[in-house]
Amino acid sequence: MALVLDAEVVLLDIEGTIASQSFVLDVLFGYSRARMADFVAARRGDPEIEAILADVAARAGGTDPVAALLAWQDADQKIPPLKKLQGRIWESGYKEGAYVSHIYDDALIALRRFKAAGLPLYIFSSGSVQAQIQYFQFSSAGDLRSLFDGHFDTDIGAKVEAASYQAIADTIGARPSRIVFFSDNPRELEAAAAAGIVVVHVVKGNTPSDPRFPEITDFSTVELRHSKTE
């Protein structure tokens, strides 16, 4: 049975929603963990790296910055300096051909369908904007950057806070009720719904169902009707 919604803008999470959570956790996180210390040591003096380390030091007190970064990654903390450094490390892996990013086939078909219908597509992820762009540039389906109209990371606010979604709506220039947000995370859906955004729970793999939200297991069951408001 199709889920039919009116929409002006599409907002999407990445991990667990349009891409495999295991790719991010096993491949990308594994790559950055194994290389973090050497990557930082080889780039001391790089202004961006030094700014990241200063931010880490301010947050971690007397803890060694690399040790703090590794601990944050192991705990899957969504901390901005960690996300920025991960993006830099992952960029080197993409460019060296160490891996290509994953995207679900059904999600990619739907994204192209939404785009062809005139719906702008935006990403909201805890990964840095830089890391998001790289993810879609080096995908298993080729360079997908042209699909997206913009990217948001936690610089705009936490993904579990309603104010973040209101800020995104304000930035895009769309009424929250005209935005449809897809995510696998109920806490994110709660926050978006509190801001007045239409939400859809994406249930892939081992993601548990949640009866509070409209739910899909395959993007082919979603029909978005593009109805621009004045």
Swiss-Prot record:
It holds the Pfam family Hydrolase. Keywords: Amino-acid biosynthesis, Hydrolase, Magnesium, Metal-binding, Methionine biosynthesis. The keyword Ribonucleoprotein does not apply. Monomer. HAMAP family: Salvage_MtnC (MF_01681). GO terms for molecular function: 2,3-diketo-5-methylthiopentyl-1-phosphate enolase activity; 2-hydroxy-3-keto-5-methylthiopentenyl-1-phosphate phosphatase activity; acireductone synthase activity; magnesium ion binding. Belongs to the HAD-like hydrolase superfamily. MasA/MtnC family. It is an enzyme of class 3 (hydrolase). It catalyses: 5-methylsulfanyl-2,3-dioxopentyl phosphate + H2O = 1,2-dihydroxy-5-(methylsulfanyl)pent-1-en-3-one + phosphate. It comes from Bradyrhizobium sp. (strain BTAi1 / ATCC BAA-1182). Pathway: Amino-acid biosynthesis; L-methionine biosynthesis via salvage pathway; L-methionine from S-methyl-5-thio-alpha-D-ribose 1-phosphate: step 3/6; Amino-acid biosynthesis; L-methionine biosynthesis via salvage pathway; L-methionine from S-methyl-5-thio-alpha-D-ribose 1-phosphate: step 4/6. It comes from the Bacteria. Its EC number is 3.1.3.77. InterPro entries: Enolase-ppase_E1, HAD-like_sf, HAD-SF_hydro_IA, HAD_sf. Its cofactor is Mg(2+). Bifunctional enzyme that catalyzes the enolization of 2,3-diketo-5-methylthiopentyl-1-phosphate (DK-MTP-1-P) into the intermediate 2-hydroxy-3-keto-5-methylthiopentenyl-1-phosphate (HK-MTPenyl-1-P), which is then dephosphorylated to form the acireductone 1,2-dihydroxy-3-keto-5-methylthiopentene (DHK-MTPene). GO terms for biological process: L-methionine salvage from methylthioadenosine. The lineage of its organism: Bacteria, Pseudomonadati, Pseudomonadota, Alphaproteobacteria, Hyphomicrobiales. This is Enolase-phosphatase E1. Binds 1 Mg(2+) ion per subunit. Transmembrane segments: none annotated.
